[in-house]
Amino acid sequence: ELKLEENPKQVITTGGVILAKSVVMASGAHPRELGIENESQLRGRGVAYCATCDGMFFRGKEVAVVGGGNTAIQDAEFLSDYCSKVYLIHRRDEFRGAKSLQEKVKSLPNIEVIWDTVVEKINGTDKVESISLLNKKTNEQSELEVQGVFIAVGITPVTDVFSGLVEMDHGYIKASEDGRTSVDGIFAAGDVRTKPLRQIVTAVSDGANAITSVERYL
């Protein structure tokens, strides 16, 4: 819990109350889940959310990437270097990602794009064995045998604790490039902040900018 209207600010934790003249909000974001059957049970057993982190564990195997934006397309391209087959599954009939990325992924022989399709269920007991698919246009159901499912459908900011305390936009904290929010003395850094690009390098930059702003504020 946070009490930002007072001075000093109060950060209430399970270990006690922390008093501070300034607070930096940097709680990050987590991958958005599909919310389908067996997704959470098989996480780490074939279900993954980071191709660059886990892709090498699927060398020579067949995998599916779910999504249609830049991240999904880049994940499919990355995995094509390790996997024998990559199925790129998108619920629409065209990608949202950059045209240059689309052309590259379409040219790779071991990537197959499956359009207008959603994943309804991930099948397997101890590990991923297959996925159940539904074509949204034809209502045709099918099952695809894969050993891995990489989910790339966006991220969700961890900002519930800040709701109502600072101005927000679709769950993200509205903050300037120097990290300043709508509340004096409160700053935001990393994936919680409104910005066009969310990567490790931009999060690190945000942290440096926010701390510099705190120093100036104090």
Feature roles, as predicted:
Residues 25, 49, 113-115, 145, ...:
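A structural signal for the hydrophobic beta-strands that form the central parallel beta-sheet
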Residues 30, 35, 40-57, 151-202, ...:
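FAD-site-proximal beta/loop scaffold in flavoenzymes
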Residues 1-12, 17-20, 81-177, 216-218:
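A Rossmann-like FAD-binding core segment of flavoenzymes
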Residues 76-77:
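Generic hydrophobic/aromatic pocket-lining and core-packing "Φ" positions
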Residues 15, 59-61, 116, 183:
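Phosphate-coordination loops involved in phosphoryl transfer and adenosine-cofactor binding
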Residues 67-69:
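Glycine-rich Rossmann-fold phosphate-binding loop(s) that bind the pyrophosphate
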Residues 13, 25-26, 65, 151:
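Redox-cofactor binding/interface segments in oxidoreductases and associated redox assembly factors
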Residues 72-73:
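N-terminal Rossmann-fold NAD(P) dinucleotide-binding loop
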